């Protein structure tokens, strides 16, 4: 009986903490998750399709464009091993979708394993009927 109560309580709390997205928001959330998976897998072919030709990537050490980001991922200069996503919000405005995520990023940078807390901003633009990533910016938080 106690087990059933605990199961119900934990299940209810998990559902309460779960964010409900509209279908349009869920499409962007799913695309963002795919991006993290492709980055972890170093799948530069899929990423090249996703990244807009004029995309920019803002890191702690600088910013650069699409080709440099793809090369950095391909060569392992930065290996995005796993993004632990804690919170996600999606906002739409003027043909763009912006994803704000609070994450812990487990990665390898220059051969060193690192784990940082970030607020990540992803800006997607709708072009030729599909969403493309225009901006990916990492803001390190003071949590750790």
Predicted regions and their residues:
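Bacterial N-terminal signal peptides
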Residues: 1-9
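Surface-exposed, charged secondary-structure patches
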Residues: 73-112
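Short, low-complexity N-terminal intrinsically disordered segments enriched in polar/charged residues
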Residues: 11-50, 92-95, 144
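Short beta-strand edge/turn micro-motifs at domain boundaries
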Residues: 117-144
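Hydrophobic pocket/interface hotspot
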Residues: 35, 47-48, 55, 69, ...
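A short gly/proline-enriched turn/hairpin at secondary-structure junctions
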Residues: 39, 50-64, 73-79
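A mature extracytoplasmic/lumenal domain signature
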Residues: 51, 61-62, 89, 103-105, ...
